[in-house]
Amino acid sequence: MTDDKDVLRDVWFGRIPTCFTLYQDEITEREAEPYYLLLPRVSYLTLVTDKVKKHFQKVMRQEDISEIWFEYEGTPLKWHYPIGLLFDLLASSSALPWNITVHFKSFPEKDLLHCPSKDAIEAHFMSCMKEADALKHKSQVINEMQKKDHKQLWMGLQNDRFDQFWAINRKLMEYPAEENGFRYIPFRIYQTTTERPFIQKLFRPVAADGQLHTLGDLLKEVCPSAIDPEDGEKKNQVMIHGIEPMLETPLQWLSEHLSYPDNFLHISIIPQPTD
């Protein structure tokens, strides 16, 4: 991969100032103060909120505590979506800090998966990585790794260790020089305006004539509603990690540098904010 290490670092160390508030109907023994945290964009809510859980459990009776879940403005937050994706999709136009409501009862079974332990997060994360490598390298790279390499990827994410994670992850970002890119680009496109969870299709980074496909090419093919058919300009905000890449950006470069740790490009299509 081309080595723009500063970009990789900026993506990894992206943070969202967040204020956690206990839901008003939760029963407490004394007033629950809000809890503030800088959330890592690349991580998962249930992986980085142990301190939040402990903070609010201190003011609650044990019998009133069941599985923790989070909500933003009435929308339950999916723990298996990366934090940065959740923010971009639901709250990118709101003022900071991001205000998240904490619940300990009435788990929304229809909207959320249960997260009984960090093992569930690890299993989901590794499943995504394996799917991404199946698309990129027919699973050859991830299958040639040892179990300790898989563990190092997970521990790097869990403990927020950039160098530990990228020492292994860089192997997943390589490809034969003669091929100009991966076999297919692992991506998921999310929209708030549809019930469909996300769009995911097979898409090659290089066209048959050898030209590099761009972000604009991807959107025209798999999500044409995001692009104006007349001039090819964006009709919506197209966001990855809180930024709007130019439509001319090669998809291969984006995949190498702006993928989340699960090796997917998580792309949010958001209506343009109205003044």
Curated annotation (Swiss-Prot):
Residue(s) of cross-link: Glycyl lysine isopeptide (Lys-Gly) (interchain with G-Cter in ATG12): 130
Involvement in disease: Spinocerebellar ataxia, autosomal recessive, 25: A form of spinocerebellar ataxia, a clinically and genetically heterogeneous group of cerebellar disorders due to degeneration of the cerebellum with variable involvement of the brainstem and spinal cord. SCAR25 patients manifest delayed psychomotor development with delayed walking, truncal ataxia, dysmetria, and nystagmus, Cerebellar hypoplasia is seen on brain imaging.
GO cellular component annotations of the record: Atg12-Atg5-Atg16 complex; autophagosome; axon; axoneme; cytoplasm; cytosol; glutamatergic synapse; membrane
Function: Involved in autophagic vesicle formation. Conjugation with ATG12, through a ubiquitin-like conjugating system involving ATG7 as an E1-like activating enzyme and ATG10 as an E2-like conjugating enzyme, is essential for its function. The ATG12-ATG5 conjugate acts as an E3-like enzyme which is required for lipidation of ATG8 family proteins and their association to the vesicle membranes. Involved in mitochondrial quality control after oxidative damage, and in subsequent cellular longevity.
Protein name as it appears in the record: Autophagy protein 5
Family listed: Belongs to the ATG5 family.
Organism: Homo sapiens
Topology versus the membrane: Peripheral membrane protein
Posttranslational modification: Conjugated to ATG12; which is essential for autophagy, but is not required for association with isolation membrane.
Result after altering residue 122 to D: In SCAR25; reduced conjugation to ATG12; decrease in autophagy activity
GO MF annotation, one: Atg8-family ligase activity
Membrane-crossing segments per the record: none
Induction conditions: By apoptotic stimuli.
Localization, UniProt: Cytoplasm; Preautophagosomal structure membrane
GO biological process: aggrephagy; antigen processing and presentation of endogenous antigen; autophagosome assembly; autophagy; axonal transport; blood vessel remodeling; cardiac muscle cell apoptotic process; cellular response to nitrogen starvation
The entry's keywords: Acetylation, Apoptosis, Autophagy, Cytoplasm, Disease variant, Host-virus interaction, Immunity, Isopeptide bond, Membrane, Neurodegeneration, Ubl conjugation
Complexes and interactors: Forms a conjugate with ATG12. Part of the minor complex composed of 4 sets of ATG12-ATG5 and ATG16L1 (400 kDa); this complex interacts with ATG3 leading to disruption of ATG7 interaction and promotion of ATG8-like proteins lipidation. Forms an 800-kDa complex composed of ATG12-ATG5 and ATG16L2. The ATG12-ATG5 conjugate interacts with RAB33A; this interaction is bridged by ATG16L1 and promotes ATG12-ATG5-ATG16L1 complex recruitment to phagophores. Interacts with TECPR1; the interaction is direct and does not take place when ATG16L1 is associated with the ATG5-ATG12 conjugate. (Microbial infection) Interacts transiently interacts with hepatitis C virus (HCV) protein NS5B during HCV infection.
InterPro entries in the record: Atg5, ATG5_HBR, Atg5_HR, ATG5_UblA, Atg5_UblA_dom_sf, ATG5_UblB
Modified residue annotations for N-acetylmethionine: 1
Reported tissue expression: Ubiquitous. The mRNA is present at similar levels in viable and apoptotic cells, whereas the protein is dramatically highly expressed in apoptotic cells.
